[in-house]
Curated annotation (Swiss-Prot):
NCBIfam families: PRK00147.1, queA. HAMAP family: QueA. The gene is queA. It catalyses: 7-aminomethyl-7-carbaguanosine(34) in tRNA + S-adenosyl-L-methionine = epoxyqueuosine(34) in tRNA + adenine + L-methionine + 2 H(+). Transmembrane segments: none annotated. The keyword S-adenosyl-L-methionine applies. PANTHER family: S-ADENOSYLMETHIONINE:TRNA RIBOSYLTRANSFERASE-ISOMERASE. InterPro entries: QueA (IPR003699), QueA_dom1 (IPR042118), QueA_dom2 (IPR042119), QueA_sf (IPR036100). GO terms for molecular function: S-adenosylmethionine:tRNA ribosyltransferase-isomerase activity. SUPFAM superfamilies: QueA-like. This is S-adenosylmethionine:tRNA ribosyltransferase-isomerase. It comes from Trichlorobacter lovleyi (strain ATCC BAA-1151 / DSM 17278 / SZ) (Geobacter lovleyi).
Length: 341
């Protein structure tokens, strides 16, 4: 199976660089795998496609303002991109500056905080220790910039602090948003629950790997990135109960989908716990837990498009993407959504 089979042409003007005026004001394409039917509705009408006893599984990760700007001892400007915490006051970071960094270097940041370059882990990958902040997370919220995707081709703005975050985000740690969840408002979630649909949560801290291109020719040769996850026992129990009642397990986003599938055994039984998920789902994979999938429209040749193709069927999904382009759907993180049932 070749990566180029997942290519498609997307006009630049269909990349959504800003969110819709209202979270649930985006469009929703509904794909029925049984009938091969395709429908188009407003996202706020998603309730019509959900049934009592369904279970909606949300990823409650919270995007951190991971971009920091500082000054080296020489006066040069440097950017730090926080990737993941490593022990006490240390983070794995990507460093970008005009000149090479060195171990032991000190970087001046906002509000008197400094960053010490401890160790080089990769070409731009460094271990950084922060000094001078008693409450690092609060400091980061004040001075950091939101890590919006590079394909938006703009700097982050104040609106991104709110809109590049789901309304139910609670567990800090992601450097990219679980974008399928961006469409929900609190009011819409309440309407969903009033219909007898339950909500459950998982946490998967979306990492930088979500933006990394696939650089091999054959899909099966790609090595997927690892991401930290947590599956609560309450969610595992809710999935079991939903199945027993004949309801559907609906994953809100590829991250919730990957978490559920990674934590399941071959019989579909979930193991509650936490760890690092590195499951790569592409056509040929047999889904063990997820019955329906809500997702955004993804990049050509991306692992996310491969996952969606595995769930909906490659030809069906690619034809839906062609229709989405023709119908002027908005693509990527701030774009429209697709529900596959």
């Amino acid at each position: 199976m070749l990566v180029k089979e997942y290519s498609f042409t997307l006009p630049d003007e269909l990349i959504a660089r800003y969110p819709a005026n209202q979270r649930d004001g985006s469009r929703l394409m509904v794909l029925d795998r049984q009938t091969a039917a395709r429908s188009e509705i407003a996202f706020s009408q998603i309730v019509e496609w959900l049934r009592p006893d369904d279970l909606l599984v949300l990823n409650d990760t919270k995007v951190i303002p991971a971009r920091l700007f500082g000054q080296k001892e020489t006066g040069g400007r440097i950017e730090l991109f926080l990737v993941e915490p490593v022990g006490d006051a240390c983070w794995r970071c990507l460093l970008r500056s005009s000149k090479r960094c060195r171990t032991g270097q000190s970087i001046r940041l906002a509000e008197g905080v400094t960053a010490e370059v401890v160790e080089q882990l990769g070409e731009q990958d460094w271990l950084i220790r922060f000094h001078g902040s008693d409450d690092f997370e609060s400091w980061l919220q004040r001075v950091g910039q939101m890590p919006i995707p590079p394909y938006l081709n703009r700097e982050s703005e104040e609106l991104d602090r709110v809109r590049y975050q789901t309304v139910y985000a609670s567990e800090s740690g992601a450097v990219a948003a679980p974008t399928a969840g961006l469409h929900f408002t609190q009011e819409l979630l309440e309407r969903i629950q009033e219909k007898g649909i339950r909500l459950a949560r998982v946490t998967l801290h979306v990492g930088l790997g979500t933006f990394q291109p696939v650089r091999v020719e054959r899909v099966q040769d790609h090595v997927i990135h690892r991401e930290r996850y947590r599956l609560p026992s309450e969610t595992a129990a809710a999935v079991t109960e939903t199945r027993a009642r004949g309801g559907r397990v609906i994953a809100v986003g590829t991250t919730a989908c990957r978490t559920l599938e990674y934590a399941a055994d071959n019989a579909g039984h979930l193991q509650a716990g936490q760890g690092e998920a590195d499951i790569f789902i592409y056509p040929g994979y047999r889904f063990k837990v997820v019955d329906a999938l809500l997702t955004n429209f993804h990049l050509p040749e991306s692992t996310l498009l491969m996952l969606v193709s595995a769930f909906g069927g490659k030809e069906f999904i690619l034809s839906a993407y062609e229709a989405a382009v023709n119908r002027q759907f908005r693509f990527y993180s701030y774009g429209d959504a697709m529900l596959i049932v």
